[in-house]
Every structure is written in C-alpha cells, then in structure tokens.
A protein has these predicted regions:
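Right-handed parallel beta-helix
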Residues: 128-250
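Feature marks extracellular polysaccharide-active and adherence modules
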Residues: 60, 67, 73, 79-81, ...
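Short glycine/acidic-rich loop motifs that flank beta-strands on beta-rich extracellular proteins
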Residues: 54-55, 67-69, 87-90, 138-145, ...
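Leucine-rich solenoid repeat scaffolds
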Residues: 431-481
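Positively charged n-region of N-terminal signal peptides that target proteins for export
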Residues: 1-4
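Extracellular beta-strand-rich solenoid/capping regions of secreted or surface-exposed proteins
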Residues: 43-51, 64-79, 84-131, 135-168, ...
Length: 481
C-alpha cells in the first residue's frame, strides 16, 4: 500500500511539474487538424515561455500547420508527444501523435550556401526539438521530388562584426522526418550537439556537419526510405515500388556528410540505399575551404561504432580527414565500396568490421577498396566479402578488391570470394599496389582463390602468415539449404 501511494504521488507531482515548465500552444490560440496556420500561436507561446523562464512549448497530438519558419528560441524546447522515434504509420500522420506540417523552403539549392535558405525548424542556442513528426504535405510525388531546404537547421548566432554571439549546442531527439528532401544541417553549431533517436527518410541528404568542434554526439539514427512509405501509400508488399524507390535513393541520396569538424562520436547509425553513406570532406564555407584556421583540426575526426551502411554504392568516401586522430570505425557493417581519395592525407581505421560489395552492374569496372596516394587504410580483426550479387555472370566483375597507391595495413582478417563465377578469372586480384604505395598483409586467411596480388612502379607488398581454405560443396561458405 505504501509503495502504491508513493508511486501515485510521484506521478501527480511530475504531471504538475510538466504543466508548469511547458506551455501548451493551445492556450495561445493554436488548434490542430483545422487546416489553419498555427504560426502566430506558436510565436506567442515561445515569447511567454521566455518571460516565465519555462522549459519550452508543448504541441499536443494532431497535425500542426506552419507556413513560416519555426525558430526555437535560446534554451527552449519544442516538445511533441512521442517518447521515441517510430515508423510514421498513417494514423500518426493523421494526428495520433504530434505532426508538424512544413510548407517553407521550397526550391532551395542545398548544395550551394544552404544556410541562406529558410528551414522548417531552426534551433538557436541550446534549443531542442523533441518528440515530433515532420512532414512536407506538398512533397506529393515520390518519383519526382521537389528540392527543399533543410528540415532542421542548427547554427551559431553572429553579430554585425561576424563575432559569435551565441553558440548553438542544438539537440534533436525522438523525432521522425517523414519525407524530407534534406534532413539535419549543423553549421558552426559548436560543441555538444546531441542527435538521438531520429528516423528519417530523405531524397537528397540525411545530415551534414560543417564547422563543429569537440564532443558532439549522434546516436540511434536510422536513414531509410521506409519512413515515407505510409505517406506515399507504399506497402511492404509493394515490392516493385519499394525497389524503384531504393534505386532512386541509390542514384541520388547521401547519408551523412562530415566537413570541418574537430571531434565527435557516432553510435548506432544505420544508412540504407544510399549512393554514398558516410562522406568526409573539407568545409563548404569558401572562407574556410583552405582549412587554415585550426590546421588539421579543421578536418573531420570521428569515432564511429556499432554503425553501418547497407546496400550502398559507396559505403565510405574520405577526401579530407584529420591527419592526427583520423576516423575510427569499430563494430561496423559496410556493404558498399570504400574510397580514400588522393586529397586525403589522414587515416581511416576499421576494427571488427564486415565489408561486402556489389549493388549494380555499373560496378563491374570498380574496385572494392581504393586508397589514394596520401591516405592510410587500416583493417584489423575483420572480414572482407566479395560477393557482387548485382553483377551477372555474363558481365563479370573486372575490378580489384584493393587498389592501393597509399598505405594499406591489413591484419587478422578473413577474405572470402564465395562465387568465383562472378569475376573475370583472368584479371582477378585481391590486391594491386601502384605508385609509391605500400601494403602489409599479416595473419590473413583467404577463402576461395588463393592470395593474388601485383605491383606497379614502386609499389611494395609485405605479406606474412597467409592462410588459404578453398570453398567447395564439402567446405561451403554458406550453410547448405
């Protein structure tokens, strides 16, 4: 009995506390599901919340229509009903939970100075977006998407002398982006950004980070077109439509781009059907494109764990990476090519990773791993599977598993090529080292063909403790059916 009373009193207290710290937009004239603009009501609620030092503004369940950009003020939260991200079922889009309908940012050029365009939601200093769906009602044709600006935008506030007046430190949690053209952009959002529990379906780009510094966290993020299916009336049984949408994403969509960044952590991030999954580049800002301000600190450096890219054309592309810390992947599944460009002077390290390759017939001439002349690729305690299912036996694969012009360090790893009928046996090689490249291969087991490699120019290979096990009916790679 005492335990029951304690629980009851706690529930009453927390409910009362919530009512005090969050102002309800309905008390300011906002009404869901009526087809009318709720911009003025939300603005009034934010102004009053700031006066009362409240925690933020609460949007109850329903469809809320915003025809102007939403600016969440410094230190406040725009809160909906959801306590976790979800697949946006039709009932959710019809008002079972909090759904924000976005009408701003149409026909924006997100690849050139994207910060000049209005976003659906802009988070100011230490502001949070929590527990909502975001949907574009006018993005009606899934096969011909219209460009829109970023759905969620985080940016520092500057004065007239371009000095930082307010650091963003934005947070997006428990939120679903249903049919965004471009998802979340963090530009000069400084320390401590926090993205957690976000599902998104995007047509062009999922997330971009540019000009951030230490200690940002991104976790539990899924980028998958299935979150748009209910909006467009696509069912799981509609295999033809699902495959067509996946093909469209494979041609056009990028998962996450990392530009100027000092340090950050990613955990449990999943990307599927992307042309490019994880991309590492220099800053998008022209004044900072030389990366001179903080030297190599201006280039991306991240620790990425328990994450993956499934059925992507390019799983990882690194053209600029921090030459000190670099980028570290651990416990990752990466189904797609890995490219380290010639402009990459840093290193990518993979520990306990699984790699696979081959999505479309367009890959027949492409290499699974490319290491540019200044780059370093390290793979430890991993498995490399070469099983290009999308490549026919009539047009076999003619690329290399590793094409190295920089440095490759490969150890304690298994190579598997289970279907030798899908590559050209006359040209197949696990490794080619060119230019002044160097590859060390140690404690590696090859399943399928024995270790094949070649060198050109000044390329060198150092191999030791190499094992081989054939693949046959008696020793299959996959269990028998």
């Amino acid at each position: 009995m005492r335990a029951f009373l304690t629980f009851t009193l706690f529930w009453i207290w927390t409910s009362s506390a919530f009512a005090q710290v969050f102002l309800n937009v309905q008390d300011f004239g906002g009404f869901p599901n009526d087809g009318a603009s709720d911009d003025a009501a939300l603005q009034s609620a934010f102004e009053e919340a700031a006066k009362q030092n409240a925690q933020g503004v609460f949007l109850p369940a329903g469809r809320w229509q915003f025809e102007k950009p939403i600016y969440v003020p410094r230190g406040l939260t725009l809160k909906g009903t959801y306590t976790r991200p979800h697949i946006a079922e039709r009932a959710d889009l019809e008002g079972a939970g909090t759904t924000i309908e976005c009408y701003v940012g149409r026909a924006a050029d997100i690849d050139k100075e994207p910060w000049k365009y209005e976003s659906c939601v802009t988070l100011l200093g230490s502001a949070t977006l929590d527990g909502v769906n975001l949907v574009y009602p006018e993005q009606a044709d899934v096969w011909n998407p219209v460009p829109y600006s970023w759905t969620v935008f985080c940016n520092n506030d500057y004065d007239e002398n371009h000095q930082v007046r307010e650091i963003s430190r934005c947070a997006v949690v428990n939120t679903t982006l249903v049919n965004s053209y471009a998802g979340i952009f963090m530009r000069w959002s400084a320390n401590d950004h926090f993205i957690s529990g976000v599902n998104m379906s995007v047509f062009k780009k999922g997330m971009v980070l540019d000009g951030i510094t230490s200690l940002g966290v991104i976790q539990n993020v899924n980028i998958h077109n299935q979150y748009s299916w209910p909006f467009y009336g696509i069912k799981a049984s509609d295999h033809a439509k699902a495959e067509l949408l996946a093909k469209q994403n494979l041609e056009n969509m990028t998962g996450i781009e990392f530009h100027r960044a000092d340090w950050g952590w990613l955990n449990q991030v999943f990307i599927i059907y992307a042309n490019k999954g994880f991309v590492f580049e220099k800053s998008m800002t022209a004044a900072d494109s030389s990366q001179w301000e903080f030297g190599t600190r201006a280039l991306p450096s991240f620790d990425i764990s328990n994450s993956g890219c499934d059925l992507c054309n390019v799983a990882v592309e690194a053209n600029f990476v921090n030459t000190g810390v670099g980028v570290n992947f651990s416990n990752s599944n990466l189904l797609g090519r890995v490219i380290l460009g010639d402009s990459c002077y840093g290193s990518l390290r993979f520990t306990n990773a699984f790699f696979s390759f081959g999505v479309t017939g367009a890959d027949v001439e492409k290499d699974q791993f490319t290491v540019g002349k200044h780059a370093t690729l390290q793979i430890v305690n991993s498995e490399v599977l070469n099983f290009p299912e999308g490549i026919s036996k009539e047009a076999p694969w003619r690329g290399k598993v590793f094409n190295v012009r920089g440095v490759l360090q490969l150890s304690n790893t298994v190579f598997a090529v289970p279907d030798t009928g899908r590559y050209d046996a006359r040209t197949f090689e696990h490794l080619i080292v060119q230019g002044s490249g160097l590859a060390t291969v140690q404690n590696v087991i090859f399943r399928g063909p024995e270790f094949r490699f070649s060198t050109k120019e000044k390329g060198r290979v150092r191999a030791s403790m190499i094992g081989h096990r054939e693949i046959s009916e008696e020793m299959p790679y996959n269990p028998p059916r």
